[in-house]
Amino acid sequence: MAAVLLLFAAAFVYGHGMDAEAASRYTIYVNRKTNIVNVVDAKSGKVVRAMYCSTGRNYSTIRGTYTTVSKMRWHALYGGVYGQYCMRIHGPYLFHSVPYYRTSKNQLETKEYNKLGTQASDGCIRLAVVDAKWLYDNCGVGTKVVIGDTRKLQKPDRKKLKISTASRTGWDPTDPDPANPYYPKLKLKKSASTKLAYGSKASKKFLKKLIKVTSRTTSTADLLENVKVRGKVDTAKPGKYKVTY
């Protein structure tokens, strides 16, 4: 029987963003009690992103309706620490990442990261890096922000992660920087070089079984759910095919 040899090119995409030109469509809702943030499409009313946050201790985060006024890639915060992907809401109140001791990605305050989902800040709204970056990239200056305690917000699909506090510093596990030690790693299994018989099935589900994705924070099964397979294998036509993950 004829056979097909598969050649693979692997590229793992970590996280995703939306068109920044659509930023003006969004309204950001914050619940100080549940410490959840929802980004809602102002036209459709649909939640496009849900996130855990840390608002101010003892409800010290301001309430009301505001519009964002500026953005800063890194910015000094109260207490001599720094935040990534900062967006000013009003006065000293910002959206930003969990604080860092220095403007270096491996200097995150690990204990503070584990407080996401609870009141922990001095008034600003803290987010995981992947979420702070999403707001920074997709919500332009002038985006409406509504902060309160009673609006029921959708919970995030992503589970809250806990990181080791054995060291007072470290990386945010959600930071999409490829240098992040938490960054998912994708490898092809030995079976990826096997030949497929003429006329056999080569579904995307089957092709996913040829790779192994690992992360220090997420199970392989959960990671595979987010892996996209591009390319088509026609086992009725002998030849070489390229499949991208």
Regions found by a protein language model. Give the residues of each.
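Short, flexible surface segments
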Residues: 62-63, 141, 198, 238
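Cell wall/extracellular polymer interaction/catalysis modules
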Residues: 16-72, 84-85, 167-169
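Serine/threonine-rich, repeat-prone extracellular segments and beta-strand-based repeat modules
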Residues: 217-245
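A short, compositionally biased
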Residues: 30-36, 81, 139-140, 206-209, ...
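Extracytoplasmic/secreted proteins, especially bacterial periplasmic and envelope-associated proteins
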Residues: 46-48, 63, 67, 82, ...
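Exported/periplasmic cell-wall-interacting domains
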Residues: 23, 72-183
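Sec-dependent N-terminal signal peptides of Gram-positive bacterial secreted proteins and lipoproteins
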Residues: 1-18, 245
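Solvent-exposed, low-complexity, repeat-rich "mucin-like" stalks and linkers
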Residues: 182-220
